[in-house]
Amino acid sequence: MAISKKKSRLTYESMLSRTPNDWDITTSALPEQVKALFPHTIDTGIKHGTVTVMCHHVGYEVTTYRIDGEYEDGRHPKQVVFTPSLIEDLKRRDFTINAMAYNDSRGLVDAFEGQQDLQKGVIRAVGEPEKRFSEDALRIMRAVRFAAQLGYTIEEETEAAMRRLSDTLTKISAERIQVELVKLLVSDHPGHMKILYETGITKVIQSEF
């Protein structure tokens, strides 16, 4: 599959010399431009800038750099604005370890010190933690799950925001919460379950236990 130089992608797993479960492919090219570059594409989520490029019967999701608008339902932005800036796109990511990108021309793009947090073993929200969790409350569960999978700690301000906003998990479906709980329980560090108690999360999701 030929990848344009505009496209950048990276996962924390590759930085830890692990085999990534998936790659996020993102680009400054607009969805229409991506579709024009490849003969076989599927309009997966044009509204949010995502096109699936088919190559040898395998689908690759390619998403245009974007800035998210206000989140009204605690999960989806009301609208998105496409941007030519990779940094603006990375600003909307949940945690610093997920806010890195790489391409052959620029190398590693790490505006939020995700590599440093990987080395320190820290889960830290990008920017203002309360804003990140207000956008999607499931990120509160994801913080604990990532900490359990990697054996990391959660940065102080990030954990404090989790505690303050734990009640917002009532907006999240039981199915989505269960997925995160299962991943936590089968992780290498299931003892991190204690974080759910320490942050008050268990009081909100007791029905899932």
Label every model-predicted segment.
Residues 1-209:
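Catalytic cores of the polymerase beta-like nucleotidyltransferase superfamily
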